[in-house]
């Protein structure tokens, strides 16, 4: 089993899975993550992840896997993003949007043998997010995906991760309940 996790591995795996068919490449960025569709200067779509962080790459890939074709033609998939410092209602909306991508991210992490941590992303907000409640929602989504089937793009990437990192097929036992994650 591969023990080292380096962002270049993810770039190579992602590009081998999706560069040709989806004209999309994974790019190490020097700043905040962003998705950029092809334009006059760059003939391919770019998933730019933050600072060479392995976890950031997996998270941004998960958002790409959620986005449909029309969303993949827009900067940052056309999503609204409210930065850190959200109030309770805005935090709730943020978490609603994040459940599905973070479920994919958890699947990717397990397939890569890499630790997963949910991200509520509100360190400076006036509300303390309930990480356990949010992780329960992400966990429930993971269980649904395992039972009903993982869509093609994330499933393809999971297979590539499993092959490279020599990890087993994903089952429910790989995703313990939040109380078990101490």
Segments from the language model and where they lie:
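Post-HEXXH active-site segment of zinc metalloproteases
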Residues: 66-99, 118-128
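Auxiliary, metal-adjacent structural segments of Zn-dependent hydrolase domains
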Residues: 1-41, 91-96
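Amphipathic alpha-helical core segments of compact helical bundles
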Residues: 63, 106-109, 139
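Active-site recognition of the HExxH zinc-binding catalytic motif
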Residues: 55-68
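Pan-zinc metallopeptidase signature
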Residues: 120-182
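An active-site-proximal "capping" alpha-helix that borders the catalytic cofactor pocket
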Residues: 95-110
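Short pre-active-site segment immediately N-terminal to the catalytic Zn-binding motif
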Residues: 3-6, 40-56
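Short helix/loop segments within enzyme catalytic domains
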Residues: 107-122
